[in-house]
């Protein structure tokens, strides 16, 4: 499909630079099947789901993956985006013209890394020096890697270390937050428990590639980035059991959805998973695992706009986004959210 079919105009003032306070006071656009669009707030979620439904969260934890370093007199900006092993990371680099394998970049605070190679996509492999865990080094020298549409408008600060982390964050490794889950609070979870809505977690370490623009003119020509994920055996069993009882699987965030679909066979059975996924979901895809999605609002012509269009239909999504813009919903990572239930999965 043509990539420009997923384009829309977004007023810049609708890009959220800070999250709602409290988190569950954010607005929630609800689109169930072909019915009317409903304007709610995230705190209403228990009323919108049924007992036996399952919310699936991503428990990845965002690391301070944004680094500024020196190679000689030159300053370079480094954004880690994928762990290769305990000490080696792939990274995107700004001001990298003279950076070459064999160079050492000093990030200050006794943190440095050697450049091992440069990939065809322009990214670099860095090997961090020393014996301390890389996570300890990053806590000392790194900052939170805010998306470019926020970082281009304001500086990262200490608030972001909390704001850009979900309450479910357990497993270090993401360089972008699974932002739909940012809206949850302990009070909301308690209300969902009382309603009989279950929850499960998986891990997908979101990479900076999630923000890369689609440069191809046609979706068939786009090369999707890969990310590492894991679904435990017990989690898969509980999800399959819920499905067999008629419960709906509602992915909280596109990262949860992509991993669930990667782990599910044509028979609709969710299986254990541990490895990379580069699944690219576009209109025409047949969903095998999920019955609905809670997700924030996405960038024009992005792979995630294509994903939600696959779930709901492209024209339906364009109508939903037109409504969101007209009603002044706040967009992107720190913005409002939506609950999308495709035709046939409403109750």
Swiss-Prot record:
Sorted alphabetically, the Gene Ontology BP terms of this entry are: queuosine biosynthetic process; tRNA wobble guanine modification
Q: What would be one Pfam family of this protein?
A: Queuosine_synth
**Localization terms from the record:** Cytoplasm
- UniProt key word S-adenosyl-L-methionine: yes
SUPFAM superfamilies named in the record: QueA-like
Principal EC category? transferase
Catalytic activity line of the entry: 7-aminomethyl-7-carbaguanosine(34) in tRNA + S-adenosyl-L-methionine = epoxyqueuosine(34) in tRNA + adenine + L-methionine + 2 H(+)
Query: Which InterPro entries does the entry mention?
Result: QueA (IPR003699), QueA_dom1 (IPR042118), QueA_dom2 (IPR042119), QueA_sf (IPR036100)
Pathway in which the depicted protein is active: tRNA modification; tRNA-queuosine biosynthesis
Q: Name one GO cellular component term.
A: cytoplasm
The principal location of this protein is cytoplasm
Q: Which UniProt keywords apply?
A: Cytoplasm, Queuosine biosynthesis, S-adenosyl-L-methionine, Transferase
- Family per similarity comment: Belongs to the QueA family.
Q: What does this protein do?
A: Transfers and isomerizes the ribose moiety from AdoMet to the 7-aminomethyl group of 7-deazaguanine (preQ1-tRNA) to give epoxyqueuosine (oQ-tRNA).
Q: Describe, as the record does, how this protein assembles with itself and its partners.
A: Monomer.
Name under which the protein is recorded = S-adenosylmethionine:tRNA ribosyltransferase-isomerase
Species in which this protein is naturally found: Erythrobacter litoralis (strain HTCC2594)
Lineage per the UniProt record: Bacteria, Pseudomonadati, Pseudomonadota, Alphaproteobacteria, Sphingomonadales
What gene codes for this chain?
A: queA
């Amino acid at each position: 499909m043509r990539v420009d079919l997923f384009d829309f105009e977004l007023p810049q003032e609708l890009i959220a630079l800070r999250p709602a306070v409290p988190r569950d006071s954010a607005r929630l656009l609800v689109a169930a099947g072909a019915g009317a669009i409903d304007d709610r707030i995230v705190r209403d979620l228990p009323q919108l789901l049924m007992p036996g439904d399952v919310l699936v969260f991503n428990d990845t934890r965002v690391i301070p993956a944004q680094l500024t370093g020196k190679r000689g007199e030159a300053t370079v900006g480094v954004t880690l985006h994928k762990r290769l092993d305990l000490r080696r990371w792939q990274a995107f680099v700004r001001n990298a013209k003279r950076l070459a394998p064999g160079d050492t970049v000093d990030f200050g605070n006794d943190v440095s890394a050697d450049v091992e190679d440069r990939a065809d996509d322009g990214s670099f492999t860095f090997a961090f020096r020393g014996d301390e865990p890389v996570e300890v080094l990053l806590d000392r020298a790194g900052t939170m890697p805010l998306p470019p549409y926020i970082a281009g408008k304001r500086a990262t600060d200490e608030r972001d270390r909390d704001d850009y982390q979900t309450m479910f964050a357990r497993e270090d490794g993401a360089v972008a937050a699974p932002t739909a889950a940012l809206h949850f609070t302990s009070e909301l979870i308690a209300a969902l428990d009382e309603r009989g809505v279950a929850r499960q977690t998986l891990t997908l370490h979101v990479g900076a590639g999630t923000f890369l623009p689609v440069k191809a003119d046609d979706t068939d020509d786009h090369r999707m980035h890969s990310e590492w994920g894991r679904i435990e055996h017990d989690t898969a069993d509980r999800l399959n059991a819920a499905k067999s009882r008629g419960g709906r699987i509602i992915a909280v965030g596109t990262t949860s959805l992509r991993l669930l679909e990667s782990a599910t066979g044509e028979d609709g059975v969710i299986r254990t998973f541990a490895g990379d996924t580069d699944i690219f979901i576009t209109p025409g895809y047949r969903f095998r695992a999920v019955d609905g999605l809670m997700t924030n609002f996405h960038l024009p012509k992005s792979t995630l706009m294509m994903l939600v269009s696959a779930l709901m239909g492209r024209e339906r999504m364009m109508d939903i986004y037109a409504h969101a813009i007209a009603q002044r919903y706040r967009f992107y990572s720190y913005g409002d959210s939506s609950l999308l239930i495709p035709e046939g999965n409403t109750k």
